[in-house]
């Protein structure tokens, strides 16, 4: 049997502001942005450049209980992990683009890591795993 996770839904306040952040600040690719009239919503998918795996489905909150989770989808823990082939290139570019890092870079046994916030406050790891770490 072969299975894989294709999308992770990320609850957002507004499609366009989320697209702006992920595409213009994090340099993700906009894979799809399709309006679904029957449900009055958009199917918006973004993915890191060069990714061949999981993508983010940007899902606009449509109910009060969904709004409560914007920016806190992991209960204050790191929610998503962005692996890179060049930590310092991406860290420096992200700082120049105004990304807020809440924990500075650290060398760990598994590689180099720093924690940043997305536009809503969800925590992400930017990391470069060392050669001994499987993905």
From Swiss-Prot:
It comes from Shewanella frigidimarina (strain NCIMB 400). To B.subtilis YwkD. Residues 4-129 form the VOC domain. This is Uncharacterized protein Sfri_3691. PANTHER family: GLYOXALASE/BLEOMYCIN RESISTANCE PROTEIN/DIOXYGENASE, GLYOXALASE_BLEOMYCIN RESISTANCE PROTEIN_DIOXYGENASE. It comes from the Bacteria. InterPro entries: Glyas_Bleomycin-R_OHBP_Dase (IPR029068), Glyas_Fos-R_dOase_dom (IPR004360), VOC (IPR037523).
